[in-house]
């Protein structure tokens, strides 16, 4: 097993996650099996109760793990399935060690950070690195580990010390450290400054880790003189200084690393069994990056949510939209709308914001209402849903978005004016959305219906069934406490709101479609968590197709392949005016 540790310096949030994912991608393209571990030094057990404003979205895994959004990057880039133990937090480590101490496993010894916490970290990493993450079930050969935060943070000290010991335990030829640092370029001088990187590497080396590669994040490509200066002061060769400058799309980052000889360096440094032949997977990434840069047509989607001021709150939703837009050769334009701005209160208090929000909504080609919690902004979301339904605008509601679509329909079409979710109005006489038996209100963490669940299609004419390739069932990831009231199903269906997908017991409403509408779909699960750059998610793909007026054409052509299998390994036709059918139909693999 080979271990690649990615650390960060100067500031957090400079792209360690994307760089770690890109390293995994170029190694996977060399026919290696790669897994990933993300270490978060906070004391929380998991990311389940985080505010979206503080940490961005909570990413959900197959096993129900609520984890950092960086694990979403790993899954999308590497096309793997991780588990909750691939996200290691200080809270999990301390909980594990304290439980052992309570059971008497330490035989009365004084339990300390060194050696007990550091040993627990090393054991966790070595155990998790061996768990298969690919569909073929083969044990990984390389483990990419991202240490969150920056070197020098008091929270990450036990982890740095653990890896200082770890490099000797697994031996030098099996361990490699990549340090990601910022090279700022002040506008006053326009000169690239190396001092922050020098100090960061000096601090890392003082803690016992010496970087093998220094990855410099900068706005423009590094000058040769700057590379040489970093090489001289950071104890690395000039070819070990890697420049990752700002690029047009993140699909360029693996290509950028490949061009600078990162794979060749790993081959020598870690003695990896990598040939020098062209890598097919990277060719696919290059095709995607080229396609992205020459898109001519655009498609606008209104994202009506609560956390629109911080785009990371909807990271997977945005990626799923991008994947689908790229598949139909359209540039995505997202119009972020705070749902509270659509409400009557805003009209009274800030009429300009109100009219601007409605102008954005009305000028969009499709409308998306994603998941969320809490009552704030829900009436604005209902207003947006009503507009999409009445104006026959393509609409996708995810999780809470689906629940509110049912609430809006019950209010307007069935005439139940006080219809609501018991989350927002426990005393409503028409509880259209109710809490589930699993929900335990006494404790907030881990009390939702989480993880991969099966949804059975109950309608042969369902648009969603066709988009999923005609399969009898789908498996998608869930994260919710409330569900559509199954007792009201018949009354809603009689008026045209069809529940075309249910859980395996037929009790939970999972997919809803409106009759006589181009695309009005709600899903209780979160399809964005399984969207991939080369396998877009069917509900999002359907929204984009409907928004550009090509959904009926796509369905008429047979939908013989699920949108999850969009690109073949040899996608040779990538012109902007390519027919959808050419992208979707099976292509012969000539290899």
UniProtKB/Swiss-Prot annotation:
Statement: the UniProt record of this protein carries the keyword Nucleotidyltransferase: no
Question: Which NCBIfam families does the record associate with it?
Answer: PRK05380.1, PyrG
Q: Which UniProt keywords apply?
A: ATP-binding, Glutamine amidotransferase, Ligase, Nucleotide-binding, Pyrimidine biosynthesis
What pathway does this protein act in? Pyrimidine metabolism; CTP biosynthesis via de novo pathway; CTP from UDP: step 2/2
Query: Catalytic center at which residues?
Result: 399 (for gatase activity), 526 (for gatase activity), 528 (for gatase activity)
Q: Which reaction does it catalyse?
A: UTP + L-glutamine + ATP + H2O = CTP + L-glutamate + ADP + phosphate + 2 H(+)
The UniProt gene name for this protein comes to ctps1-a
What organism does the UniProt record list as the source? Xenopus laevis
Q: Which InterPro entries match?
A: Class_I_gatase-like, CTP_synthase, CTP_synthase_N, GATASE, GATase1_CTP_Synthase, P-loop_NTPase
Q: Per the UniProt entry, what are the Gene Ontology biological process annotations, in alphabetical order?
A: 'de novo' CTP biosynthetic process; CTP biosynthetic process; pyrimidine nucleobase biosynthetic process
- Identify its protein family: Belongs to the CTP synthase family.
Q: Which CDD domains match?
A: CTPS_N, GATase1_CTP_Synthase
Q: Which domain of life is it from?
A: Eukaryota
Q: What does the record give under GO molecular function? A: ATP binding; CTP synthase activity; identical protein binding
Q: What does this protein do?
A: This enzyme is involved in the de novo synthesis of CTP, a precursor of DNA, RNA and phospholipids. Catalyzes the ATP-dependent amination of UTP to CTP with either L-glutamine or ammonia as a source of nitrogen.
Q: What is its EC number?
A: 6.3.4.2
What name does UniProt use for this protein?
A: CTP synthase 1-A
Q: Which SUPFAM superfamilies match?
A: Class I glutamine amidotransferase-like, P-loop containing nucleoside triphosphate hydrolases
Report the top EC class in one word. ligase
Listed Pfam families: CTP_synth_N, GATase
GO CC terms for this protein?
cytoophidium; cytoplasm
